[in-house]
């Protein structure tokens, strides 16, 4: 083999190695972002528990309409968005705790599959921001001390799942950073607890990979 041929093979091998290295560092999106402003009917949504519907809510981003959960006697209330399953994903939603004496919370459900899921939630009756997993019952994974979000005001929840790295934000503040790999993919949803009456608006789901 000539010296020129050896150099060509070496250059090609180096290029392939560089491309493989780049591919390992960057995950291609699974598909387009999903955005829900709740101006249309809830086609494709799946109610697991609770009483969910579209209502006029002050401060909603578009047309004054938001998704509201009104059941007050269930332990937990969950609704699943269309699409998925999602593995690595970034999710955000605006929520407004309207009322609740036992609880006044709002949360994002992610990697929901066969009734099991992760949850990040805030509660207007508690000075904490928490990450849980649910498998027949709820288990706390991580908690941050905060000033409880104000009742009757809009707030923003965000969660990012990258493999086993689960992170959470409240009103743009990074508060949770935890590792847990028991659930790898599933659907996205919204959550309330007990007697919480809560409005949700501007749900955004950004897939990071093919899940």
Indicate residue ranges for each PLM-predicted region.
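Short, aromatic/His-centered strand-loop micro-motif at the edge of beta-sheets
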Residues: 136-156
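Extracellular carbohydrate-recognition regions
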Residues: 26-49
């Amino acid at each position: 083999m000539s010296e020129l041929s050896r150099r060509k093979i070496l250059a090609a091998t180096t290029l392939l190695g560089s491309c493989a290295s780049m591919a390992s560092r960057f995950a291609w999106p699974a598909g387009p972002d999903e955005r829900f402003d709740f101006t249309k009917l809830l086609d494709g949504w799946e109610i697991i528990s609770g009483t969910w519907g579209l209502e006029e809510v002050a401060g909603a981003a578009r047309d004054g309409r938001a998704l509201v959960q009104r059941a007050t006697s269930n332990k937990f209330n969950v609704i699943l968005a269309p699409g998925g399953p999602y593995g690595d994903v970034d999710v955000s939603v605006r929520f407004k705790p309207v009322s609740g004496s036992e609880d006044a919370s709002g949360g994002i459900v992610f990697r929901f599959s066969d009734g099991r899921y992760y949850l990040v939630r805030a509660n207007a009756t508690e000075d904490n921001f928490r990450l849980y997993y649910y498998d027949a019952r709820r288990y706390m994974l991580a908690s941050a001390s905060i000033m409880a979000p104000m009742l009757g005001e809009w707030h923003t929840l965000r969660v990012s799942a990258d493999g086993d790295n689960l992170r959470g934000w409240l009103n743009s503040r990074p508060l949770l950073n935890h590792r847990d790999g028991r659930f790898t993919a599933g659907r996205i949803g919204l959550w309330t607890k007990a007697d919480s009456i809560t409005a949700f608006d501007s749900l955004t789901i950004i897939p990071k990979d093919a899940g």
